[in-house]
Amino acid sequence: MPVPPPPPPPLPPPPPPLGAPPPPPPPGPPISTDAPSLRKSDLKGRSALLADIQQGTRLRKVTQINDRSAPQIESSKGTSKEGGAAGSNARGGSTPPALGDLFAGGFPVLRPAGQRDVAGGKTGQGPGSRAPSPRLPTKAISGPLPAPASPRLGNASDTHSSARPVPPRPSVPAPPPPTTPPPPPPPPPPPPPPPLPPASPIKAPSVSPPVPPTKGNPSAVPAPIPCVPPLPPPPPTPPPLPPASALSEKAVRPQLAPLHLPPIPPPLPLLPPYGYPALHSEPSSPAQDVREPPAPPPPPPPPPPPPPPPLPTYASCSPRAAVAPPPPPLPGSSNSGSETPPPLPPKSPSFQTQKALPTPPGAPGPQIILQKKRRGPGAGGGKLNPPPAPPARSPTTELSSKTQQPGGQLRNGGQHVIDDFESKFTFHSMEDFPPPDEYKPGQKIYPSKVPRSRTPGSWLQAEAAGQSSDDIKTRNSQLSLKALR
């Protein structure tokens, strides 16, 4: 390292011949005035460097200069011997060289990305202005004779060096355009993402359409209709079906009101219509499961009161219904009980399994959920009117869907936060539970009741007194009985 210091002294003289080109840049003249002016010029140079660096890959040349910047540190040391010039070089030269080393190490490689131009420009300014100075001596070392250059000459050399980098930069801008084009490529990537969203909607419809054909394969819609015609009221009920389906898609709450109104005159039609919206709503998308759950619970309450008279008619139609729409027959079978033959419930699950197989993977989940919803609410609705009824139905529901209950209940619990527990789950009647243990009054001593005494043996005395006191026992027993009741 001691060898490089000698070459720096010749550096100041060569710049004068090169002074002709530098004059065009404005920063040159102010630099020669004073040290503060040097700082201002440095700021201006930084702005220019930032603009130039943003334009293109100028730092690649800087990398070459930065490789030679190591001697520049010694040059600052050597000039320090000279005098005033040392201050200017030491201020700017002490920090930038390290940055120059860092730039030489990794920054130029990262530059091409075009993202760090601004950050690199701020830090790279110092090395950029300082680095060219070594290059000048290398070119004009032939004239090292005037080695004893005054500090002003050194300043002039700095001015020329700072101005010198500017000419090479104009030559460099040619490469910058290639770097600027890369930014345009990034914009094209954003357009590809938009196509993706369209693809997702396409996927959603693709999932939904296959479901309806599967539903259409079994003659679910036509079969129950013949069962309904015999009744006089059914004609008014079919019109509500389409609005119900539309409402189920839009908002379930409005649907509940129309369902409650029509069911009173024709209880039977309510079940098939109630099944239809479910079928229509299922194909729409599994995402609507959240909306569907609230709909089923309210309708079930109306069916329980009328079931006895209409059940036989519905039972007569139940064979077709059981084959066509699986969900409606299940509640019908559970309600009819002895009226319908036992094999019907097994048929419905078998058909459900067949139906679940053709449907896409997303469909079977909602079907199971809907089935559970209809069963659970039916049992809950029955429980609302007569408490003893639910226990009779609960075993049927449990037998018909042992495997489906746990998952369905969990899913319903996650989805129905608004509904009551009775609509979600099947509960046992009070008779099913064993009676609570009889209350047997015993000796109870409460410290608050005991007379306060500062003697240490007060507790023992209190216990003895409590055992003999019957009034406290009777009070405690009465209070506890009231609390239990």
Swiss-Prot record:
Organism of provenance: Rattus norvegicus
Domain WH2: start-end pairs: 45-62
InterPro entries (UniProt xref): WASH1, WH2_dom
Residue positions of motif RLRK: 58-61
Motif (Profilin-binding motif): 3-8, 11-16, 20-25
Modified residues (Asymmetric dimethylarginine): 46
Keyword line: Actin-binding, Cytoplasm, Developmental protein, Differentiation, Methylation, Phosphoprotein, Spermatogenesis
GO biological process: Arp2/3 complex-mediated actin nucleation; cell differentiation; endocytic recycling; exocytosis; retrograde transport, endosome to Golgi; spermatogenesis
Induction per the UniProt record: By aldosterone, corticosterone and RU28362 in hippocampus. By corticosterone and RU28362 in cortex. The response to corticosterone is slow. Does not respond to vibratory stress. May be regulated by both the mineralocorticoid receptor and glucocorticoid receptor.
Protein location: Cytoplasm
Miscellaneous field: Suppress the growth and endocytosis defect of yeast lacking VRP1 without correcting the actin patch polarization defect.
Record comment regarding domains: The WH2 domain is found in a number of putative actin-binding proteins. The profilin-binding motif has been implicated in the interaction with profilin and SH3 domains.
A GO CC annotation given for this chain: recycling endosome
Protein name: WAS/WASL-interacting protein family member 3
Family note: Belongs to the verprolin family.
Positions of modified residues (Phosphoserine): 150, 208, 394
Basic and acidic residues bias: start-end ranges: 417-441
Composition bias type Polar residues, residue spans: 63-78, 396-407, 475-485
Function: May have a role in spermatogenesis. May be a regulator of cytoskeletal organization.
Principal cellular location given in the protein's record: cytoplasm
Residues covered by region (Disordered): 1-485
Sequence ranges of Low complexity compositional bias: 244-259
